[in-house]
Amino acid sequence: HQDPRTCYPGTGFTQENGFGSVKGFTLNFPMPPGTSDEKYLEFFHNRIIPQFEEFKPDFILLSAGFDGHVRDPLAMLNLTENCYREITKDMRTLAEKFANGRIVSLLEGGYDLEALALSVESHIQELLK
């Protein structure tokens, strides 16, 4: 997600990682405004996927927000539906590897309706493979 210093609601800092007995189970990876598909996917592969290797989840729950799309008026990331497709492909692969294919996706944000439709279509097509 985008750096919380630059967007609403101002939460999701790296140090916000849970509390009490679940401290450390929430991971936030804020990205600077203007982040491209290439940079986002590079970060995803190098920093996020290794977390799955360590955690080995029983199932994967995706909060599928598409407001990072370059055409979306809310965020200032420069992602495209192709980036969302690649992330979904990787998440599906992780679900197959660790969670016996168990993956649930819940729609969250996306406020440019055409960009949202393209992103959701890419996401669902990849989930169904």
Predicted regions and their residues:
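Conserved alpha-helical scaffold segments that buttress catalytic/binding sites
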Residues: H1-L62, G68-M76, T80-E81, K89, ...
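Solvent-exposed polar/charged
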Residues: E53, E96-K97
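Short active-site-adjacent structural elements
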Residues: H69-D72, R102, D112-L116
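Short, electropositive alpha-helical surface patch
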Residues: T80-E81, L113-K129
